[in-house]
């Protein structure tokens, strides 16, 4: 008799405990899936120090469970939906990190099906964490079925009331906390403009994803109007009439009269994945068994060279590419947003469009990965590319690094062949000058010594004390990619030095990456700090070579958004007024103004721009807004009125 009295009470207690405990378990499964592992270090370094973020994520799962349960009175469904709410984005996040080095972001929802296809084609397989999580979720669903079986039935009024209360609490949490930056920052969730991967590691998948929803809105710059645009461009045009020192006094453009400069050369852009001159580490206690940058060092003696200040670290390739092709700064866009996916959704001003519409160029892009990756298949036409050769169309290419990338990555050597073949095809089909832009993939993160056989891999022969074997192996993997990129550079310059027409080749790296899972390569040697915001880790190697001038020019460091303006200035090409403005900014205000870091004209950096630098930054943003989102008033100044029909002021 007593047993019968205690059983309902115990059952009631279990029913009360199940929702919070089950959703807490689901939260841990979510993080396990997203990270690929869940160790003691995960808790001590990430979860416990940022417990408030995980408490918010748990509350979202718990309230969602309650809302579904009140509505359906079927606990297994509530348990299953809560699990899907947490674990499905976590799985997508895991694969997204593997593919592009960045986590699952809200705007990725626009191409979920495409991402799934890319993941399948890339040879990515289900992980142990996912299999175990599925088993645990099934067990939770089964337990909830038996635990809540025979529960007292309720009529519709209390069920609706319970659902509305739970739904209201869920909405309050979403709109009153997650989508309120002032609130989330007050409780310790700090935006990370540099590295979304780190943001997700600190605050977890659910909290990071939901707080990123605030990054979807573009605000019109203060004072935006046709008069403001005209005033800036009128001043820019007038400034060209004043005699002043050239941007680069020893350059071909500065030392050759305007009547004698080459007018419409072939222009080749190569953005090489994760490229920077790793031989720089030989000044910091490292030694390699081969000269990994022999061609680069030779070409620097007869070319313009320097560094490109990248807006990205550890990922975000498309941000760098976007800046280089347009002169637009990704820093003006919401933190974490991806321009190709969100903003390059209509034809707009860019270097390819300018060359095509005003100079009669034919344009093509070559990328040895899937066309839909970063939405390049839709962004490239809007930037003015007539042709896009992607991995789907490539034949007879070699692939390497299959230990991590099971389907392999196309080699830089094969990419050189693809570039040459595409160039020859364009020259055969038309007499129009050529602009060809290429993006490589061979040296994509992650790095592991097993990606190359021992007889191929570059060896580290000396290094600072204390580095792990895995870190040395990762550095060898990375250095092998740099050696092969250097060989590609040599192959391209050798070929284009022999063609019977003027050619410009611009070669640069998109961003630095962590080598292994940390910054030990940089910190152990004193090369850089362990902060991804360190300016040293944003200055990738940049080379501008041509087959019709051998004047060496020290470019210093320039922003990635200045690559095209500087290229045109360097070789005396006709520049659009927007690029003239950026070159003036580079000459009188700053070398770069990126993600909160300003590089002064003397190469020093600051997080506190001067009033002059602020003024130039405001001009830059106002024109960028006009060309990307506004009425396109500036287009008529540059002979690109045909794009104006696509402009709408948001």
Where are these regions (language model features)?
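Transmembrane and membrane-interface helices of multi-pass
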Residues: 2-200
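Alpha-helix initiation and N-capping motif
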Residues: 109-112, 202-206, 226, 293, ...
